[in-house]
């Protein structure tokens, strides 16, 4: 009976947590909807008197607004990509692993599996990175998200403002969202400023639109400052080919810690996020090279790392049955979450 109550309580808490996780997104949506009303109706249609100025303001605003909302939508609803079955323990191996009481035998099982996978990063102690929650050997740059309760390929961070994990599948969209958010706030602030001054000096009649125009400038400037800092930080990460997690915790390779292990040079670093076709850089469609399981590394020469020798292997590969080249593995295995 008590166990049933505990399970019901746990289920209720999980449900409440899922509902509450959408609150930050709802706040952003409400602010954006109000900004749309304030700019389009209260500023352009009511306050601005010149027809030509109205048209120009509205066309440019909606062009930015479309890309702003499009990238936000993609950041929210593009699901995080998880490691394929090659990295998971099979049902039989999982049963053997869980039933095995000898730690050294468990370690050997995982070492044998790691030797067949393209994994080159290790834990801080030099052990193979194993997730005991998902029962898989983590691909390079993959981490377990406690909020999403899954391992996420090339995980950057979990963002409450999009209620999603930012990783390999949607990092490009998230970066674009930051860029268009900065542009959105900047455009509003610059076009509203002159009317803000007119209202402040009393050159325009004090009507209902006054509040919306004054507050619109304040909100745009406030969000612009915070967003431009965050966007600048992520631009720096992209230029170094780092994730947020790697910036705070230096990745460890088979040869030891290397903070620039994935740094391929400025242009190639950008291409690792946006792809090599510049026509897709500003559009929120998937163009990041690779499958999220393997990445070219600076610390390995072309003979050691086939991804550097053949850039064609960077292209998306959705075949979970693909045979991976054997990679070296340490003899120690340590679970990491």
From Swiss-Prot:
Transmembrane segments: 21-41, 57-77, 173-193, 211-234
Stated family: Belongs to the DHHC palmitoyltransferase family.
Disease entry from the Swiss-Prot or TrEMBL record: Intellectual developmental disorder, X-linked 91: A disorder characterized by significantly below average general intellectual functioning associated with impairments in adaptive behavior and manifested during the developmental period.
Entry domain remark: The DHHC domain is required for palmitoyltransferase activity.
Residues in the Cytoplasmic compartment per record: 1-20, 78-172, 235-337
Protein name: Palmitoyltransferase ZDHHC15
The keyword Acyltransferase is annotated on this UniProt entry: yes
EC number(s) from the headed UniProt entry: 2.3.1.225, 2.3.1.-
Keywords: Acyltransferase, Golgi apparatus, Intellectual disability, Lipoprotein, Membrane, Metal-binding, Palmitate, Synapse, Transferase, Transmembrane, Transmembrane helix, Zinc
GO molecular function, one term: protein-cysteine S-myristoyltransferase activity
Membrane topology, Lumenal segments: 42-56, 194-210
Tissue and organ distribution: Expressed in placenta, liver, lung, kidney, heart and brain.
Domain of life, source organism: Eukaryota
Gene Ontology annotations of biological process type: peptidyl-L-cysteine S-palmitoylation; positive regulation of dendrite development; protein localization to membrane; protein localization to postsynapse; protein palmitoylation; protein targeting to Golgi apparatus; protein targeting to membrane; regulation of dendritic spine morphogenesis
Domain DHHC: 129-179
Chain segments carrying region Disordered: 306-337
